[in-house]
Amino acid sequence: MLRWLIGGGREPQGLAEKSPLQTIGEEQTQNPYTELLVLKAHHDIVRFLVQLDDYRFASAGDDGIVVVWNAQTGEKLLELNGHTQKITAIITFPSLESCEEKNQLILTASADRTVIVWDGDTTRQVQRISCFQSTVKCLTVLQRLDVWLSGGNDLCVWNRKLDLLCKTSHLSDTGISALVEIPKNCVVAAVGKELIIFRLVAPTEGSLEWDILEVKRLLDHQDNILSLINVNDLSFVTGSHVGELIIWDALDWTMQAYERNFWDPSPQLDTQQEIKLCQKSNDISIHHFTCDEENVFAAVGRGLYVYSLQMKRVIACQKTAHDSNVLHVARLPNRQLISCSEDGSVRIWELREKQQLAAEPVPTGFFNMWGFGRVSKQASQPVKKQQENATSCSLELIGDLIGHSSSVEMFLYFEDHGLVTCSADHLIILWKNGERESGLRSLRLFQKLEENGDLYLAV
């Protein structure tokens, strides 16, 4: 479906022809995205998309340009030029709710060792910050404290007026790769294979200065941490290059769960073929997470895994969801999931329940959950019985969007305006719900006829 609009599909890569890649026919009855708009403005890889409001988004990438788009029409609204090298991070800094002047700031970091703060409604540069000793790889906003943080070889804290409030000493030549806020005025930073917990100390009557203190280092990962997100207010999750998934307590920073076993010799492949597919560490690298109140969705190598927070186990997986590594995953309404890959495809999945047969226990080799140390065999018996009798799920392919000719880096979902994807082919594609768009066109036509008086004349 949609292959003819662009001119051909993707070529299988690597071991794709040997892998059990799920396919779908041309008649994708459950796929609403039957129309597309191709947006051209960039001259290099487009790596980032960020939503500005209900109808606007910004794109950025290796050409150093930021472009603001209308998600409904695909119209190019603004082009922000200022960086001389590729953009490495982009975030928005919304106005405070108490502030009367509602201007949204866009912050961009670049390999040119600068951060530029932009007015989100104009092309105006509010300020350029060029005091960094290394490339800033991540940015995050602490809305409650009305500050933002930049992470490179050190960690800096800034206010809305762009004053440097405090900073850490040099942390690592590797630099901070990811950064999230956790409770108690703390943030957790991924630095190589380490997690570092920092606490922000705001000014008080006794001290007028801000400070940032290192309070703990978590050394449980065996390889570089590639992904880090909050699960909820009480926990966060990390994933590494060699397929380690760890769930952490966000309050006391202890390990709640650890797993690095992402294959078993079960139905999809025979043992030798499965082992062959998993020989390269890249096949089990955890590239991205997303979550909701019930599940964590993990992009692991070429596969997708759904881990139930309540049942403490994987409830569904597609070990070969794409021909190449899955780079981004997000949850949609109606138990749907979207993934994109280095193979140039975007795929839509539906999480469906299926009752396990009594003789077919739910696999427990994925994400086995334990607290502090191993549980005893006796203590694990009730858990095992519960898993064997529990309802498991499957990920069923319901849509395959073929439009990009190279790696799809990430995407955004707009409830009213469709799906936006960006790619190494320099393009952005706006995927539209065909039925909805047809209805809107008909409505606009009737409104125009009514305004001109032609509707009554025709009747």
From Swiss-Prot:
Tell where it localizes: Cytoplasm
Alphabetic keyword roster: Autophagy, Cytoplasm, Repeat, WD repeat
GO BP of this protein:
autophagy; negative regulation of exocytosis; negative regulation of immune response; regulation of autophagy
What main location does UniProt list? cytoplasm
Annotated phenotype, changing L445R = Reduces interaction with the C9ORF72-SMCR8 complex. No effect on interaction with SMCR8
Q: Which SMART domains match?
A: WD40
Tell me the subunit arrangement: Component of the C9orf72-SMCR8 complex, at least composed of C9orf72, SMCR8 and WDR41. The complex is formed of two protomers, each individually consisting of one molecule each of C9orf72, SMCR8 and WDR41. The protomers homodimerize via an interaction between C9orf72 (via C-terminus) and SMCR8 (via N-terminus). Within each protomer SMCR8 (via DENN domain) acts as a bridging protein between WDR41 (via C-terminus and N-terminus) and C9orf72 (via C-terminus). The C9orf72-SMCR8 complex associates with the ULK1/ATG1 kinase complex.
Its recorded name reads WD repeat-containing protein 41
Organism listed in the record: Homo sapiens (Human)
Its gene name is: WDR41
